[in-house]
Amino acid sequence: MLATAALSIGYQAKADKGMWLLNELTRENVAQMKELGFRLPIDSLYNLDKPSVANSVVIFGRGCTGVTVSSQGLIFTNHHCGFDAIQSQSTVDHDYLRDGFVSQSFSAELPIEGLTVSYLSSIRDVTKEILAQLKKPKNEIERLSQIQKICQSLEAAESKRLKSEHKRVQVRPYYANNKYYLITYDVFSDVRLVFAPPGSVGKFGGDTDNWMWPRHTGDFSVFRVYANKDNAPANYSKDNVPYKPKYHATVSTEGYEKNDYAMTIGFPGSTSRYIPSFAVENRMKDQNDPRIEVRGIKQDIWRAAMNADQATRIKYASKYARSSNYWKNSIGMNKALVKLGVLDQKRAEEASFEEWVAASGKKAQAYKGILSEMEGAYKKLGNIERQSMYLREALIGGTEIVSAARGLGDSAKVKKLASQPKEQLAQMINDLYKDYVPALDQKVLPAMLDIVRQRVDANRVAPIFDLINKEYGGDTKAYADALFANSVVPYKDKLLATLQQPNAAEILSKDPAVLLSNKVWEIYTAFSNELKPLYEPIDRGNRLYFAGRREQNPSKPMPSDANSTMRMSYGTIKGYSPADAVEYDYFTTSRGILEKNDPESTEFNVFPSFLELIKKGDWGRWADKKDGKLHVAFISTNDITGGNSGSPVFDKNGRVFGLAFDGNWEAMSGDIEFEPNLQRTIVVDIRYVLFTIDKWGKCSRLIDEMTIK
C-alpha cells in the first residue's frame, strides 16, 4: 500500500497535524506512528481487499461517522449524530430524547426511515483521466464546468457497471482541485435504533459546555445495520437480518495514560488550511458575523418556546441543536483566529510565497499575481456576500415559512404535486410539517425581517419591504400576523385542502407566504448571480496557490483539506494549558457530573435514575484499573473537524477506546490553522459508554455481543 503514496512521498510526517488519506500513507507517516506507539502491521490498518481496522468505520447518516463493534452490525456513534433519529421516534408519551431508549431484543429495535450507513468499498485515482479530457478551458469557471461534466460521466459509467441501487459512486477533488479520486460505497438503508442514553447524559452540558473542556457528556448512541438474507444492502424489510460486517472493531477497557497513542478514522467534512489572509477575513466578517447575529436572535425565540412546551421542545430539539452548534462554532472561530494571530501567520506565508515566485523566474510564472487577483476579488465580493449571508440566514434558514412556500408559485410544480394520490400527498405533507409549529414561526418572521432591514441595502430588498411599509406602516409584526392569518402554507390541513382544489395553482400564486417566498428567492438568486463571476479568480487562485506552495516547500507535509471522505489522524493523549497558571488534565471522571449537576438547569439536570447510579459509585468492570474511578471523557492531539463526530478513537493495537465528539474552545480556528499546543479532540471514554449500557440500561445482550478486551 505504501507505494501508492503519490503526492506525499518524501514529506516529513507530523503527529500534530494532518487528516491523512489512508491510501496515501507514506513510510514517513508509518515511522512516525510507530514512534508514537502504534503496533499493528499497516496492512491490518487499511486494506479494502481483506479485513482491516478501517473496514469497521462508516459514514453515519449524511454528516457523521460511526464504528462497527460487533459481528452483528452494531454501530456506535455520537448521541448528537443519532439525535434526529431519536427525535423522529419521540412523542410526548414516549420521550426518548429526554428519557433515553433501550431495546432488549432485536425485535424491539426501531427502524429509522431515511437513515443510511455507508461502508467504503473502493477508491481509484482518476486524475489523469479527467485532465486528459479537458478542452482548453478559457477560465476557471469553464474549467470547473468541464471537470464537473467529466466527473458525472465517470460516476454514471461506474454506477452502470455496478448495477446496484445500494452503491453510491462519487468523484471527489483533493489538494485544492489538483487531484481526483473515484470512490464507491456500499449503502445500507435498513438502520435501526438500538440504544440511546437519557438526554441529560447524551447532551449533558447543552450549549454551555458545547465546544468546551473539561467535559462530562455521554455523547453516544447505538444503532444496528440490517441486510437481506444474502448479507447484502437492502431496503427495510421485516425479513432482514443483522448485517455481518467484513470486520468489526475490538473494544478496549484497558484505559490509557498521558502520551499514549491515539488514532481517529472518520469522514471529516471541510477544512480550509491553505487559504490566504483575505479569505480568512472574509470567513470572519462576511460569513461568521451574520451567522452569529441572526442565529442568536432566532435561537432565543425558539428556546423560550421550547422551555414553555414539551411538544415544541421535541419538535425543535434537533433543529435547535443544528443551529446552535455552528452558531457557537462561529463565535469561537472568530475569537481564536484573532487570539492566535492567524491573519499575521497567513500574511507571512503570502510574503514568503511572493518572494519565492519572484526569485524563481519562469519556473514559477504560473503563480505570478495570483494572490493580488484573489485579494481584489475578495474586496469586491465581501459586502455583497455579507448581505447575501444575512438574507440567507434570516429568511431562508431562519424563518421556516419561506422555504416551505418555495415552488408553490410555480403552476407546473403545483399541478404535478396535486396530481399525486390523496393518501400519498397527505403523507408527504404530514412528514414535511411533523416538526413545524406555525405560531412559533410567526414570532420568528418579524425578528428576521427586522435584521434584514437593518443589514441589507434597502434597494436590494425593496420588493419585500415596499409592501410592509405601504400596507403595515413598516410594522413587521403586523405583517407577519396578517401573513399567517391569510396564508394556507403554514397549516398542513389547509395546504392539503387547497392542493385538492381544481384551481390550486391560481390560489397559491396569490398566497401571501408564496409571494414572500418568491421575492426572497428572487433577491437571493440575484445575489448569487452577482457573486458567481467573482469566485473565478478565487477558485483559480486557490488551486494554483496550493500547487505553488507545494513546489515552494517540497519537504513540508500538506495533507489535503477535508472533503467528507475517509481520513485518519494520529496523535497522543495529552492535556493542555489554555492560559497562564491554568492547566487542564487529560481526562474527566464521574465526580464532575455530580459537581455540575443542577436540578434547576435544563442543561445540567441529571436524569434521576442515572444520578443515583453515579452517587452509588459501583463502577464494576468499567472502573479505571489504576485509580478505580469511572472515567467519562479524555482529550488527545488528534486533528478532527465536523463530520468526525462519532469517529472511533483507536489505541496502539487498533482497538476502540473512545468516540470523538467535539473540539476545544481555545482552538476553534482549527479548520483554518492547526495549533498543536492548544488543539484537542474531546472523546467520550468507551468505558463510560459501556457503563451506561450495562448499569443504567441493564442491556447485557449488547455487552455480550461485543468483543471487549
Range-by-range predicted roles:
Residues 10-709:
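Terminal presequence/propeptide segments associated with secretion/organelle targeting
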Residues 1-8:
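Bacterial N-terminal signal peptides
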